[in-house]
C-alpha cells in the first residue's frame, strides 16, 4: 500500500485538511471525559464552586483567614480584592495563574479556620489545649494572642496540614467558601445550576464540533479515496492498453479484470478507512495516554497491562491469518478464470456433455475460496470478544482501584469516571486499528498486484525520436531476415523470413497449423517486435516509428471476429469515427454485410450486444471486415478472416474486396487454398521456415509443401 501513496500527491491539500480535522476531533473527544469529571467533582460534589477562591467574602472572615497567612500572602490577597460595603469582592479581570496562586494561599488557612470553628470534638480539644474557653469566638481570641505564640501555633497546625492530601485541602476550602456564601445569603443552588448549565453547553458544543469534524473527515477521505481509485484505474487501463502481446500472456485476462476492478476497489475502501481510522486511532490513543498521565498516574499500570495483552493477541492472530489473507486474491483470480471460461465456453460444454466436469471445476475453486474465507473469518471472530473482555476487565480493575483511591481521599469520583472513559478511548483506538487490520492484508496484496502491473516494463515501446516515412512510399511491407522467439522460449517460432509486399499487391501466407502464420503478421502492427532482422512499413523499420503511426496505416481483421457493445454503425466506424454514412454503407456492401443488415428493423442502428453475442459468427466476421474497410488504410491484414464464411460469400467478398483494395497492400493468412489462388504472391511456411514464395502456378511446380496442401483441398481440375 505504501508504494501506491505516491498517487495521493494530487490530494495533498485535502490530506493536510483531514489530518487537521482529525486532531480537532480527537481534542474534542478527549475533552468530554474531563467535562464529565468536572460535572461530578465540581458541579455535584462542590455545588458548582470550582476552587478555594471566594468571589465575595465578609471582611471579618477575611481577617480570620489572614491570621494564618504569611505577611506577603496577605498583601497579595489584598491586591486582588476591593471593598464593597462590609464585604470584599474579587476583581473582575484575574488571570488563570493569579487564581491558582490565590487558591494555594487560601487553602491551608481555610482548613485551619474550618477546623477551629466547627462543633467537632477534635475542634473543642484543640481550643482547650490553646486555653480558649468553650463558647468564646476562637478567631477573636486568637487575634489577641501574642504574635510569637500565634506563629508557633500556626507552624504546628501547618505541619499537620502538609501531610494531608491536596484533594482534601481543596475540598475543605470549597466547603468553607460554600458556608461563607450561605452566611452572606448567596443562592448556592443557583451557583451550582449555572455551573452545570455552562459545563453542559460546553459539552454539547464539543460534541457538535466532533460530529462536524467527523462528517468532514468522512467526506474528504471518501473524496481522496475515490480520486485515487479513479487515477489508479486510469493508470492501470493506460498501462494495460500499452501492453504488447508478450505482457498479455504474462497476466491472464481474468487476473487483469480482477486487478482493474476488485483490487482497486479494495484499495479505495482501505484508503477511505485509513484516514478515518488508521490516522485517527493513534492520535486518539496517544492523546488519551497524555490526558491520563496529566490527571493521575496511580492507575496507569492497568492501561499498560491492557495494551500489552492487546498487542500480544494481535501479533498471534496475524501470524496465523496473514498467509491466508495473501492467498485470498489469488483464489479470487482462479474463481474468476474458471467462471469466465465456463461462461464463454457454454456451447462447447453442452455439446460435449461436460456440465458435470465444469461444475466440479467451479465447485473446487469455489470451495477453496470459501474455506480460506471461513478460516480467516473464524480467526477474526476471536478478535472482538477478546477486545471486549479486555475492555471490561479494565473497567472492573479501574473501579476496584479507584474505590480505594476515593476512600483514601487521593482521588475524586469524577476522576475515576474520567479515567474509565479515557481507558475506553485508548482501547477503542486499538480496536479501530484491529478492525482495519482485517482489510489491510487483502488491500496490501491488492496493492502489490496493481503495482506489479504498473511496474511491468512494456517490451514494445515508442522510440524517443520516431521516424516519419516518406510520402513517396506508401503501402509497402518488407520482412528482412526476420526471426522471432516468444519470451523464455528456447526456439524461434519463425526463422529468417524475407519478402516484400508492394502497393496494390496481395500477398497470401499459408502453412500447416502452428507454422507461425499469425505470429508473422503480428509483427507488422508491433503486437510483438522481431528478435532478429527488421520489419519495414513504407520503407521504415516499424521499431523506429510510433505504434500509433504504424497502426494508423493498417486495417487489421483478427482470426476471431471481435465486436463491441453499441450498434452496427458504431462498430463499422470504430477505426475512423468521422466517416460519412455513405462510407459506412459502402464498407458494409463490400464486406457482404448488407444482406443481413437490411433485414433488421433498425438496420445500421441495430444494437450489438457485448462481444457481438447477438449475431452469428459469419455476420460478426463480415462486420469486422467492414470495420477495416471503412478505415481505408494503406495496408490490409486478414488473419484467416474468411474461415467463418461460406464458399459463396467468401468468393463474392473476395471479388468485391479485390476491386476496393486495388490501391492498397493486402496480406492474407489463409487455411483454404481457394481463398488465395489469385494472390500475387503466396508465402509458404513450414515449421516457422519459409518453404517457398511465388504465385500459385510457380509454387505448384517448385514447392512440395504447398503442393501437398493444395492437393489435400482441391482436385487437379480445380488447381489447373
Where are these regions (language model features)?
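Transmembrane helices of ABC transporter permease
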Residues: 17-24, 273-328, 397-411
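Short intracellular "coupling" helices and adjacent cytoplasmic loop segments at the cytosolic face
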Residues: 44-51, 58-63, 70, 138-146, ...
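Hydrophobic alpha-helical transmembrane bundles that constitute the permease/transmembrane domains
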Residues: 11, 23-31, 204-215, 267-270, ...
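Membrane-integrated ABC transporters
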Residues: 1-204, 209, 213, 217-221, ...
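ABC-type nucleotide-binding domain
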Residues: 15, 51-54, 66-71, 77, ...
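Helix-loop-helix
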Residues: 291-308, 312, 375-449, 453-454
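An intracellular "coupling" helix at the cytosolic face of ABC transporter transmembrane type-1 domains
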Residues: 135, 146, 150-153, 245-246, ...
Amino acid at each position: 500500500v505504501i508504494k501506491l501513496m505516491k498517487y495521493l500527491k494530487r490530494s495533498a491539500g485535502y490530506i493536510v485538511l483531514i489530518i487537521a480535522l482529525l486532531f480537532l476531533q480527537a481534542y474534542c473527544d478527549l475533552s468530554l471525559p474531563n467535562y464529565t469529571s468536572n460535572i461530578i467533582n465540581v458541579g455535584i460534589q462542590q455545588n458548582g464552586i470550582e476552587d478555594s477562591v471566594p468571589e465575595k467574602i465578609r471582611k471579618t472572615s477575611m481577617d480570620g483567614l489572614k491570621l494564618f497567612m504569611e505577611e506577603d500572602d496577605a498583601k497579595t490577597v489584598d491586591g486582588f480584592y476591593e471593598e464593597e460595603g462590609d464585604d470584599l469582592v474579587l476583581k473582575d479581570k484575574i488571570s488563570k495563574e493569579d487564581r491558582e496562586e490565590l487558591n494555594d494561599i487560601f487553602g491551608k488557612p481555610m482548613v485551619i479556620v474550618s477546623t477551629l470553628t466547627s462543633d467537632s470534638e477534635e475542634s473543642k480539644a484543640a481550643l482547650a489545649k490553646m486555653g480558649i474557653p468553650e463558647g468564646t469566638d476562637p478567631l477573636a481570641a486568637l487575634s489577641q494572642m501574642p504574635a510569637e505564640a500565634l506563629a508557633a501555633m500556626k507552624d504546628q497546625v501547618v505541619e499537620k496540614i502538609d501531610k494531608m492530601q491536596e484533594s482534601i485541602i481543596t475540598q475543605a476550602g470549597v466547603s468553607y467558601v460554600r458556608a461563607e456564601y450561605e452566611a452572606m445569603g448567596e443562592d448556592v443552588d443557583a451557583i451550582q445550576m449555572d455551573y452545570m448549565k455552562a459545563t453542559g453547553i460546553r459539552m454539547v458544543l464539543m460534541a457538535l464540533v466532533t460530529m462536524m469534524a467527523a462528517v468532514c473527515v468522512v467526506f474528504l477521505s471518501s473524496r481522496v479515496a475515490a480520486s485515487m481509485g479513479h487515477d489508479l484505474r486510469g493508470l492501470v487501463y493506460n498501462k494495460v492498453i500499452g501492453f504488447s502481446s508478450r505482457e498479455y500472456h504474462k497476466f491472464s485476462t481474468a487476473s487483469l479484470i480482477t486487478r482493474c476492478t476488485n483490487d482497486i476497489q479494495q484499495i479505495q475502501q482501505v484508503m477511505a478507512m485509513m484516514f478515518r481510522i488508521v490516522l485517527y486511532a493513534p492520535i486518539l490513543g496517544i492523546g488519551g495516554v497524555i490526558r491520563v498521565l496529566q490527571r493521575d498516574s496511580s492507575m496507569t499500570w492497568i492501561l499498560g497491562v491492557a495494551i500489552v495483552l492487546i498487542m500480544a493477541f494481535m501479533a498471534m492472530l496475524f501470524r496465523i491469518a496473514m498467509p491466508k489473507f495473501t492467498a485470498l486474491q489469488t483464489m479470487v483470480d482462479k474463481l474468476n478464470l474458471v467462471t469466465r471460461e465456463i461462461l464463454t465456453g457454454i456451447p462447447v460444454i453442452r455439446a460435449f456433455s461436460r456440465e458435470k466436469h465444469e461444475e466440479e471445476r467451479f465447485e473446487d475453486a469455489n470451495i477453496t475460496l470459501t474455506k480460506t474465507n471461513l478460516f480467516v473469518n473464524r480467526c477474526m471472530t476471536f478478535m472482538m470478544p477478546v477486545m471486549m473482555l479486555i475492555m471490561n476487565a479494565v473497567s472492573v480493575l479501574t473501579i476496584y482501584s479507584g474505590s480505594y483511591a476515593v476512600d483514601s481521599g487521593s482521588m475524586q469520583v469524577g476522576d475515576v469516571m474520567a479515567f474509565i472513559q479515557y481507558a475506553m478511548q485508548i482501547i477503542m483506538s486499538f480496536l479501530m486499528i484491529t478492525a482495519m487490520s482485517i482489510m489491510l492484508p487483502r488491500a496490501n496484496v491488492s496493492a502489490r498486484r496493481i503495482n506489479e502491473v504498473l511496474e511491468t516494463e512494456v517490451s514494445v515501446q515508442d522510440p524517443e525520436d520516431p521516424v516519419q516515412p516518406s510520402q513517396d512510399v506508401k503501402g509497402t511491407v518488407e520482412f528482412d531476415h526476420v526471426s522471432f522467439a516468444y519470451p523464455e522460449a528456447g526456439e524461434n517460432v519463425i526463422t529468417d523470413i524475407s519478402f516484400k509486399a508492394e502497393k496494390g499487391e496481395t500477398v497470401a501466407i499459408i502453412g500447416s497449423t502452428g507454422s507461425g502464420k499469425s505470429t508473422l503478421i503480428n509483427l507488422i502492427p508491433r503486437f510483438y517486435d522481431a528478435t532478429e532482422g527488421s520489419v519495414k512499413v513504407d520503407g521504415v523499420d516499424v521499431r523506429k516509428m510510433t505504434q500509433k503511426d504504424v497502426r494508423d496505416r493498417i486495417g487489421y481483421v483478427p482470426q476471431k471476429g471481435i465486436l463491441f457493445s453499441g450498434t452496427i454503425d458504431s462498430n463499422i466506424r470504430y477505426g475512423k469515427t468521422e466517416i460519412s454514412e455513405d462510407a459506412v454503407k459502402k464498407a458494409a456492401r463490400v464486406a457482404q454485410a448488407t444482406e443481413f443488415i437490411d433485414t433488421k428493423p433498425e438496420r445500421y442502428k441495430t444494437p450489438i450486444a457485448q462481444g457481438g453475442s447477438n449475431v452469428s459468427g459469419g455476420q460478426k466476421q463480415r462486420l469486422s471486415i467492414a470495420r477495416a474497410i471503412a478505415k481505408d488504410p494503406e495496408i490490409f491484414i486478414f488473419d484467416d478472416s474468411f474461415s467463418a464464411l461460406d464458399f459463396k460469400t467468401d468468393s463474392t467478398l473476395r471479388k468485391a474486396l479485390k476491386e476496393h483494395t486495388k490501391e492498397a497492400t493486402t496480406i492474407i493468412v489463409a487455411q483454404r487454398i481457394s481463398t488465395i489462388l489469385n494472390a500475387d504472391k503466396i508465402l509458404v511456411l513450414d515449421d516457422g521456415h519459409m518453404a517457398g514464395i511465388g504465385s500459385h502456378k510457380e509454387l505448384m511446380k517448385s514447392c512440395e509443401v504447398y503442393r501437398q496442401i493444395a492437393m489435400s483441398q482441391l482436385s487437379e481440375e480445380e488447381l489447373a
